[in-house]
Design a protein with these regions (language model features):
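Solvent-exposed soluble domains appended to multi-pass membrane proteins
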Residues: 1-214
């Protein structure tokens, strides 16, 4: 979909002297990322084949290993050069019905027997632990740092349906307002220095970059 250079956030940050890195622990040709990322202004792109020694959860590189990669990039950057890293994780990608030798779901919902729901919630907890690791690291960093954490979409209906059923609903009986909620995702903007605290603000992912720069 992107075939020419665009004035995206990495382009702007590069003009300010930032090193700009895109990292995605999956195949480089997915959605033509290896071609698109440079057009968006990233000076370096890192894909699955460069996640040497990474840990896996199910069949995907773990979020914990993604955090390790971000920290590695930060620690090896040239001193005094600011760094922008855009990391698209894979750990929690669907589907959620298969079984794996390296992952045992350990979260359940009372009154619900659902492998997809249990698997998804257990994966989210691992993501939460990885985020804690990332935040804890940059809390101690001397350089001012902002972390933006968000998802691109909610899990599929195999995960949502059991919760809806528990509340007497199905995916087909949702009102228009309820259906809209299926297309909302939470986000967090955190910094290791004082910024204006705000909660409950609805926005579009299109505007997250502007919010961070504000």
């Amino acid at each position: 979909y992107i075939t020419k250079e665009l004035p995206a956030l990495p382009v702007y940050l590069a003009s300010l002297g930032y090193e700009t890195v895109a990292t995605h622990p999956y195949y480089a040709d997915g959605w033509d990322r290896d071609k698109v990322y440079p057009l968006l202004g990233f000076s370096e792109s890192i894909f699955k084949d460069q996640y040497w020694g990474a840990g896996y959860v199910r069949k995907y590189v773990s979020d914990n290993s993604c955090v390790d990669k971000i920290i590695e990039l930060y620690e090896k950057k040239e001193e005094g050069t600011p760094l922008f890293v855009f990391n698209v994780t894979m750990q929690n990608h669907g589907g959620y019905s298969d079984t794996y030798d390296n992952f045992t779901p350990d979260i359940t919902v009372e009154g619900v027997e659902s492998t997809p729901l249990s698997q998804y919630l257990s994966l989210v907890r691992l993501s939460d632990q990885a985020l804690e690791k990332l935040i804890s690291y940059f809390e101690e960093a001397d350089e001012k740092t902002i972390v933006v954490f968000f998802g691109d979409h909610q899990p599929n209906d195999t995960v949502a349906a059991p919760i809806l059923n528990l509340n007497g609903m199905t995916t087909k009986t949702l009102t228009e307002d309820q259906l809209k909620l299926r297309y909302e995702v939470p986000y967090v903007i955190w910094a290791n220095y004082d910024i204006d605290a705000e909660s409950g603000k609805d926005t579009s992912a299109n505007y997250l970059a502007a919010d961070v720069l504000h």
